[in-house]
Amino acid sequence: MAHIRAPTVTIPLLPLPKQTVLLPGVVQRVAVSSTRPDIASLLAAVYAKAASQTPNGRIDTIPIACVPLASPLIGPEGHLLIENGDDKTETADDVDPAKATKADLFPYGVAAKITGVEGRGTGEFTLLVEGVTRIHVEKVISDKAYLEGKVSSYADPALITDAALEELFMSLKLLSRQFVTILRLSSLLPQSSGTPGLSPLLARRLDFYIAKQKYPGALADFMANIVESSYEEKLEILTLIDVKERVAKVIELLDRQITNIKNSMRVTTITATTLPFPMDPDAAKHGKIKPPVKAPGHGAGMPFSPQGGFMGRGGNADEDQEPNEIEELQKRLDAARLSPEAAKVADREIKRLKKIHPAQAEYAVTRTYLETLAEIPWTTTTDDRLGPDTLNRARKQLDEDHYGLDKVKKRLLEYLAVLRLKQAINDDVDSQIKQLEQELGVASESSKEDAAQSTPIDLGVDEKAKAGGDKLEALKSRRMVDKSPILLLVGPPGVGKTSLARSVATALGRKFHRISLGGVRDEAEIRGHRRTYVAAMPGLIVQGLKKVGVANPVFLLDEIDKVGGSSIHGDPSAAMLEVLDPEQNHNFTDHYVNVPIDLSKVLFIATANSLDTIPAPLLDRMETIYIPGYTTLEKRHIAMRHLVPKQLRVNGLDESQVSFTPEVVSRIIESYTREAGVRNLEREISSVARGKAVEFADAKDSGHPENYNPQLTVDDLEKFLGIEKFEEEIAEKTSRPGIVTGLVAYSSGGNGSILFIEVADMPGNGSVQLTGKLGDVLKESVEVALTWVKAHAYQLGLTQSPSENIMKDRSIHVHCPSGAVPKDGPSSGISQAIALISLFSGKAVPPTMAMTGEISLRGRITAVGGIKEKLIGALRAGVKTVLLPAQNRKDAKDLPQEVKDGLEIIHVSHIWEAIRYVWPDGQWPSEHDYPSIESRL
């Protein structure tokens, strides 16, 4: 490539110290001492010229020529004088730079600028000179205080127009980066090896400079200054005005230096192999790679890997040589059967990976990303066990694992039935597609033979093939697409939501993975981090898919109601919208993977304790199934069937050594636990089992095992569990006016009981006193009941005239026992009204009759909740008859048969109807006697 020569100019000449060569783009320090008066004079002249030519007196605008001393071993044009080198009696070391003449100077040098002057505090200082461009000394015109001469400069071309130079430039870059890498790795060797080292920070800076350099001449000069070379070789490079020749020379020096470093590494028992870059100019030009060089013997050190790292200890290079990791990665990606979008991205990243040096941080990032793509199950699925016995097997599995929970089981069996029918349809469609493809294949072969034998074109064959293709596409469109439901199980803790999801996976024969969402506050935990972040990784969904290795697992999203809200880290609940939307999750995009992933085959089952904290858009995407707390009967069944055998086994006992009766379990449930689930019940059973284990061990160790009684009675519970923690109300044998038995369901869920409503009157001014730690709603129920009784006191026979106030000169006190327990809710309205009527009329309510329901000012009895728990508690307390709102008739149908048989359930819709059932002997008006105007709009 032709160089650009500038006109001749006159500038000061600075002879460089011995064995020193300054190249363009390089900064050099030149010491100014008493032995170099010429430099002081030159610097004074530069300052004077700068002061006269520039406003600020900047000395870096005044050029000088830095010229090295000549060498007797090299000619003026850079040719090595081998033939007469031995005849030279004077060497460059014998020349004093301060007294150098034109004959002592090398013809080539560098035009430079003085970038700074550093003082040392001892009277000496140092010049900082930066090379700018090559120059040729044409003539020395002054040699008084300092040298001055006429020089011509040569500038490198700005554009690369030669293909050969461009290829050499790429080879120079590869070798330069290899050189930096091997210097960095050599720093890990013992210092006694003599191999130069390189800090990680400097290595990264050099690697960045090499990658960003656009000019081959500048990079060649820079690397020539770094690489180890002789004084004469540097002079030769200084004379190479042609960029192509200069780059080739530096490639030669780099190749030699790399070889020397590798040999040094071998001496320190490091088994080396050839790096995957060209090692000589010819190989660099043609892109060839030398074969690996076997290390002598079996080194005990760490062999150097072709990928730029270290391999394991021991063995030689041939034994420890691993397969090319890029090829292995390509095989894994091919085996993963990526989606079209993922395959396109993987191909692009593989090409990038081949161009990235293994020592670069980007190499590890790209490799990790490709490994993640290979580990995601794009098409791998678990075959669902959907045979003729699918529903029976699943029903049996769910019944064995969980007692009750009929609504959940019903929904899951519906899903299995739909899945089974869809699979049958798809199997039939697949057989038709296969048959049609075979027919089209035979027709295609015959058409090819006919076309080879006959010249005319048969248009009928094309029409037939087109019709067959249309039919094939129509058949493929008939395939049923499975969209798994997204279920939300809502219920109190300990009712089996998590274990139910695991049973579903077992019944389906699918893999199961649990994702805990409690406390997740960062959107990136769901969607993953961008690859641009340090230590980025995919989100919980993609990590779960990688772990199970199939595209159709059962994912349990545990505690979805406890996901953090919107913050500076994003909104994780909003990130779940795409995951849990059946219409969108077939194209779920993780920030790290950044490729659409199909989640439509995943069966998501979420759990929550409450719906209050779940955002409405997220709740709308899930099918909510409520799991109420277990009743006492259900707890007893679960304990006898699951918990007792489990705890006996855990504590080293068997059923013959401890006998739990249903009565004992019922007492533990009623008197020692009050919860919706069975976790505390299991703990109490475990405590009893441990106590019996101590008794059995003592009897066995004493040699009198016959003294041990395996039978467990109700009276033994206080010894193992202490005094009873909860007391159950029992229906009284006798009754008195003003006392009514109400029903209550505990807020913990699963338990219910009776609650006495006590009303007393006293002389007063019509005030009402409420006690028993009653809530606001319960207080309002008392006010509504009292208002209705006062309004209908004349019809009830409580006053002599309609205008008489029954509360005149009277005050009442309403109390609910268990005053330390908070009570609230509207369900005691009917009980309050009946209790007030009983007090004012002096008629007692039957003690074995209980009631629940909300009352309105019109006297209507409206529906309440917790019917199942309340009635089970009523039966346990000895109640015989229960008054329920007519609107709760549907809830009574779901009661256990034991409750239906043990209670007389009466449904009432108005307070007058309830009064007639409570006191059937009285003459009471009907609610129809007091018609009301109601809007039907």
Swiss-Prot record:
Q: Which SUPFAM superfamilies match?
A: P-loop containing nucleoside triphosphate hydrolases, PUA domain-like, Ribosomal protein S5 domain 2-like
Q: What is its main location?
A: other
Annotated catalytic residues:
827, 870
Any one GO MF annotation of this record: ATP binding
The domain of life is: Eukaryota
User: In this protein, which residues make up the domain named Lon proteolytic?
Assistant: 734-921
Q: Name one GO cellular component term.
A: peroxisomal matrix
Q: What's a single GO BP term from this record?
A: protein import into peroxisome matrix
What are the UniProt keywords, alphabetically? ATP-binding, Hydrolase, Nucleotide-binding, Peroxisome, Protease, Serine protease
> Which PROSITE patterns does UniProt cross-reference here?
LON_N, LON_PROTEOLYTIC
Where does this polypeptide localize? Peroxisome matrix
At which positions is ATP bound?
491-498
Residue ranges for motif Microbody targeting signal?
A: 935-937
- Taking the record's annotation, the residue ranges forming a coiled coil are none
Ranges of residues in domain Lon N-terminal: 11-258
Q: What reaction gets catalysed by this protein?
A: Hydrolysis of proteins in presence of ATP
Give the enzyme's EC designation. Answer: 3.4.21.53
What InterPro entries does this protein map onto? AAA+_ATPase, ATPase_AAA_core, Lon_bac/euk-typ, Lon_lid, Lon_proteolytic, Lon_Prtase, Lon_prtase_N, Lon_prtase_N_sf
Q: Which family does it belong to?
A: Belongs to the peptidase S16 family.
Q: Which HAMAP family match?
A: lonp2_euk
Give the protein's biological function.
ATP-dependent serine protease that mediates the selective degradation of misfolded and unassembled polypeptides in the peroxisomal matrix. Necessary for type 2 peroxisome targeting signal (PTS2)-containing protein processing and facilitates peroxisome matrix protein import.
Q: What is this protein called?
A: Lon protease homolog 2, peroxisomal
* Species the sequence originates in: Neurospora crassa (strain ATCC 24698 / 74-OR23-1A / CBS 708.71 / DSM 1257 / FGSC 987)
